[in-house]
Swiss-Prot record:
This is L-ectoine synthase. PANTHER family: L-ECTOINE SYNTHASE, PTHR39289. Belongs to the ectoine synthase family. It comes from Thermobifida fusca (strain YX). It is an enzyme of class 4 (lyase). The keyword Amino-acid biosynthesis does not apply. Gene3D superfamilies: Jelly Rolls.
Length: 134
């Protein structure tokens, strides 16, 4: 069994901060469970375009609100606490937080924590062997 708190993540290489967001990667590929799990805060007033060509992502809002636009269809959705969106078709999308937007995210395949968004807003498909987490 793995037990972790956000305090365990803060200030480590699993605590990723950019101009638009902060993502604390709580479960990663090295944990060997087939998915990764993150708590991410996207900052109010920012705009972030992403395209997970190599991953499926589920995003569940627990605080704040944002508009999410499917860049392929032009559809825009208001995401509020208790609402999720699932990028099951690898959709290019843009997130525009109206307030600080706190979400819980699940990625499959799992990310390693070393990924950075490329020029298309995508993560490369990296692999990492599971390590002993005892």
């Amino acid at each position: 069994m793995i037990v972790r708190s956000l305090d365990d993540i803060n200030g480590t290489d699993a605590d990723v901060v950019t101009e638009n967001w902060r993502s604390r990667r709580i479960v990663l590929a090295r944990d060997g469970v087939g998915f990764s799990f993150h708590e991410t805060v996207l900052y109010a007033g920012t705009e972030t375009s992403m395209w997970y060509a190599n991953h499926i992502e589920l995003v569940h809002c627990i605080e704040g609100e944002a508009e999410v636009t499917n860049d392929e269809t032009g559809e825009t959705f208001l995401i509020t606490p208790g609402t999720l969106y699932l990028l099951n078709g690898h959709e290019r999308h843009t997130v525009r937080p109206k307030t600080d937007f706190r979400v819980l995210c699940v990625f499959t395949p799992p990310v390693t924590g070393r990924e950075v968004h490329d020029e298309n807003g995508s993560y490369p498909l990296l692999t990492e062997d599971a390590t002993d987490t005892d």
